[in-house]
């Protein structure tokens, strides 16, 4: 697909569509739906790990709902474009914590961020992560589903990772900052090989297993 907006649902084997359009396109099997946050830049540059990751989710019997974002609006995608059974129940009881929730929001059973960094502000919010924690926790608390950060290493190649472990700055991006928001079970999915990002199959299996 050729993305033309800053935030959109991605389906590699068919044209991009909104959550609502995809959900109305047919009956969904009773499989867990996983919201996945992806870098828009990586979608545009056709990084090979994105279709590989989505395919692995599908092969595991999961329904991926991938959204590409610029990085700084991850909290908007989670807050407005994703909903859950818990949030639906709360809204039916009059507890509308997220007034900006889209009527076409996709219902998910878990959320996976392949970006790292704080949920609110992304890379731009790293220096103010502590100040935004309450906002992030409020957004995630309204959804009340697992929030997992499973990101490839964007500033470290696979060779150095396997030999020396995850570097200091990369560790902050992948572990420390997301954990402030309440992320659980962080997984490093892969890393750089030249200019491209590749997945490590064993790490992907840990995520979806």
Label for each model-derived stretch:
Residues 1-209:
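An N-terminal assembly and electron-transfer interface module characteristic of large anaerobic redox
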């Amino acid at each position: 697909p050729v993305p033309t907006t800053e935030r959109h649902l991605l389906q590699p084997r068919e044209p991009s569509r909104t959550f609502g359009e995809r959900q109305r396109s047919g009956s969904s099997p009773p499989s867990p739906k996983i919201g996945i946050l992806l870098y828009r830049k990586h979608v545009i540059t056709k990084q090979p790990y994105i279709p590989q990751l989505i395919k692995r989710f599908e092969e595991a019997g999961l329904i991926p709902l991938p959204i590409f974002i610029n990085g700084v609006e991850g909290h908007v995608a989670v807050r407005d474009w994703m909903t859950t059974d818990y949030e639906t129940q709360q809204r039916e009881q009059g507890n509308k914590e997220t007034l900006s929730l889209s009527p076409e929001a996709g219902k998910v059973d878990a959320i996976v961020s392949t970006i790292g960094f704080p949920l609110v502000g992304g890379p731009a919010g790293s220096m103010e992560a502590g100040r935004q924690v309450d906002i992030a926790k409020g957004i995630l608390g309204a959804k009340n589903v697992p929030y997992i950060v499973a990101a490839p290493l964007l500033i470290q190649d696979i060779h150095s990772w396997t030999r020396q472990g995850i570097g200091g700055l990369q560790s902050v991006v992948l572990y420390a900052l997301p954990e402030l928001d309440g992320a659980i079970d962080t997984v490093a999915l892969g890393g750089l090989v030249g200019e491209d990002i590749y997945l490590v199959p064993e790490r992907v299996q840990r995520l979806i297993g």
